[in-house]
């Protein structure tokens, strides 16, 4: 499934683990803080993996495109 990750990491928090996550899934940069990732993980597992690399006060959203080309988004 194709997913877009968009984020706003709170000033002073570390971006490096999020960038490692994005690189692990060969993310394609769309804008300064938006990446496209294609993977087979379920949305719940995908969100759990992202939560491991951010802090609770960071803002991260995932926009998914399903096989029917429908869009939906969720806050991580």
What is each PLM-predicted segment?
Residues 2, 30-32, 57:
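Short connector loops at helix/strand junctions that flank enzyme active sites
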Residues 9, 37-39:
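Hydrophobic residues in beta-strands and at strand termini
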Residues 19, 23, 39-76:
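Charged interaction segments
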